[in-house]
Amino acid sequence: MKKKLEKKLETLEHRDKKYSKIRLNIKPNREGSKIPIKVNDITFNYESKEPLYKNLSFQIANRERFLIVGQNGVGKSTLLKLILGKLKPTNGNIWYGNKTDIAYYAQELELLDLNKTVLENIDKKEYSEKELRTILGSFMFYKDDAFKKTSVLSPGEKARLSLCKILLEKANLLILDEPTNHLDPETQRIIGENFKNYEGTIIVVSHNIDFIKQIDINRLLILPTGKITNYTDEKLEKFLESTKE
């Protein structure tokens, strides 16, 4: 038993070293605005329902890591859709810096064309096929994986491909809605390094403590109260503990 465990640990260590050699160093196409986005006194409700939030205001600084948390149904994903312009606030407005470029990861994995291969889904003219396959390697797609039809991928594989795709957009503001939902802890840790090192602003909805710690969150927005505070692990853990039944 001991020998088997030692062999497994040795294999994992070797694999981690292999992954670390191909981590990405992709940068945004341009530096973002000093203030990429301001949410100004917004209220939002779906038709004939109570407002999800009233008079919510905040602004985000360039390269900030901003975390949104709350129980199910309080409007976390809705707030992201308001920021993206997919929904309009009932009152108030959202302002964008003139250098703000946005890329969005949806937990529904809607970014992917299921009729294309893995490689075709991330095809960018600025990269050669060899470069693209190296990039795919940093998201744990190897060799013939590049030619798999996206429709046959598992949810975890689709999530990895979607995360790869949004990084290749080279936007200076990444909006991530539960990016680790389909990932096992080891995969999340490896892929999370690509976001930890990204030289842009990140707004993320997540309850994955390991991922949150990994990408160095600066501030925390708690819904539905709208309370904003500087991030600490203790504050997040206290909030998560308060939501347990």
Where are the model-predicted features located?
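ABC ATP-binding cassette signature C-motif
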Residues: 31-245
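Flexible nucleotide-interacting loop at or near the entrance of a catalytic core
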Residues: 1-52
